[in-house]
A protein has these predicted regions:
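Non-catalytic nucleic-acid substrate-recognition regions in nucleic-acid-modifying enzymes
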Residues: 1-120
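Conserved S-adenosyl-L-methionine
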Residues: 168-246
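S-adenosylmethionine
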Residues: 238-261
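Short acidic low-complexity segments
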Residues: 122-129, 240-245
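Short, well-ordered secondary-structure micro-motifs within conserved domains or adaptor modules
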Residues: 48-60, 126-138, 250
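A positively charged, amphipathic N-terminal helix/segment that binds anionic biomolecules
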Residues: 98-101, 133-136, 178-183
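SAM-dependent Rossmann-like transferase core, predominantly class I methyltransferases
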Residues: 141-183
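Short loop/turn segments at strand-loop or loop-helix junctions that form parts
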Residues: 95-99, 147, 254-257
Length: 261
C-alpha cells in the first residue's frame, strides 16, 4: 500500500475506525472474503480503515479495533491536542500497537506510551484498566484512540464434547457466518448438513437465528449435545433429511460430507 493511499485513508473523516487483521497465508482468501462482506473492501495490508463500527470479537481475523480520536503527522501534535482538549480517563492504560508498517523502535514505543499517559487527565491502571488506549504509527501518520481487542472467547467452542476430524474448522465456520450474512442479523440461516454443529454454534454465538439438520441420528444427537453444552436449545438441531425441509430461510451454509454416505 502506497504512502499516498494511506494518507488518503487517514485523511478521510468518514473513517472513524482502524482495524488490524491477522491471518495465515492459507487463510488469506477466506479473510479477504470476510472483510469484503463486513466492510465492502479487501485490505491490501494487515489493516483497514472504515466508517463501520464492528466488534472485533465477531471475527476470527480482526485482532483489534481502534476508535480513532486523532490522526496526525507527529506524536507531538497528538500530545498537544490531548493537553489542549483535556482528554480524561480514569483507570486507563496506553498501549503501543505494532502495525508492521513503518513501525518505530522499542525505545520510541515506550517513550510514546509514557508521554501520552503523562498528559491524559486521570489515573492509570496498568493491571486492571477500565479503558485501553492505543497509539499506532502507519507510515508517516500517527493514530490515537480507544482500543478494543478481540477477546477470543469464541475459541472455547473448540472444547465442545463431540468433535470429528472431518468437521469444518472453528475459524472457518465463524468466518463463513460473517461472509454469508454480511453482518445482517435480520437474516435466518439453515445448515442442512450440520454435522456436530460447528457452524450452528458460531451463528448462535453471533446472535443469528439458525436451524441445523443432520441426516445421521447419532451425529445429530452429538450436535444437540454440543449446542446444549454452550447453553443453547438442543431442539435447534433436527435429525432428518435436508430434502424434507419445508421452511424458507434467507441463507444456507452447506458443507456437504463428501464420501461419508
Amino acid at each position: 500500500m502506497s504512502i499516498e493511499l494511506i494518507n488518503d485513508e487517514c485523511g478521510n473523516t468518514q473513517n472513524k475506525y482502524f482495524y488490524f487483521i491477522n491471518c495465515s497465508d492459507m487463510e488469506k482468501e477466506l479473510c479477504n472474503m470476510e472483510m469484503k462482506s463486513i466492510f465492502k473492501q479487501i485490505p491490501n495490508r494487515k489493516f483497514l480503515f472504515s466508517n463501520k463500527d464492528f466488534n472485533p470479537s465477531r471475527s476470527p481475523f480482526i485482532k483489534f479495533k481502534v476508535n480513532i480520536i486523532y490522526i496526525e503527522e507527529s506524536l507531538e501534535i497528538i500530545i498537544n491536542k490531548i493537553k489542549n482538549e483535556k482528554i480524561s480517563y480514569d483507570d486507563f492504560k496506553v498501549n503501543y500497537m505494532k502495525s508492521e508498517d513503518g513501525d518505530v523502535s522499542y525505545e520510541n514505543r515506550l517513550k510514546a506510551v509514557r508521554e501520552i499517559g503523562f498528559v491524559i487527565n486521570g489515573f492509570p491502571d496498568i493491571h486492571n484498566p477500565k479503558v485501553e488506549l492505543a497509539i499506532i504509527k502507519i507510515k508517516d501518520k500517527w493514530i490515537f484512540g480507544e482500543l478494543i481487542k478481540n477477546d477470543f472467547k469464541w475459541q472455547k467452542h473448540n472444547d465442545k464434547p463431540h468433535s470429528y476430524s472431518n468437521a469444518i474448522p472453528l475459524r472457518m465456520a465463524r468466518a463463513l457466518v460473517n461472509i454469508a450474512t454480511c453482518d445482517d442479523k435480520r437474516l435466518s440461516i439453515i445448515d442442512p448438513c450440520c454435522g456436530v454443529g460447528t457452524v450452528v454454534i458460531e451463528a448462535l454465538d453471533l446472535g443469528f437465528n439458525i436451524k441445523g439438520y443432520e441426516i445421521s441420528k447419532p451425529i445429530a444427537c452429538n450436535a444437540r449435545n454440543n449446542i446444549e453444552f454452550f447453553g443453547y436449545n438442543r431442539e435447534i438441531i433436527t435429525s432428518g433429511d435436508m430434502h424434507n425441509i419445508r421452511e424458507r430461510y434467507d441463507v444456507a451454509i452447506v458443507d456437504i460430507p463428501y464420501g461419508l454416505y
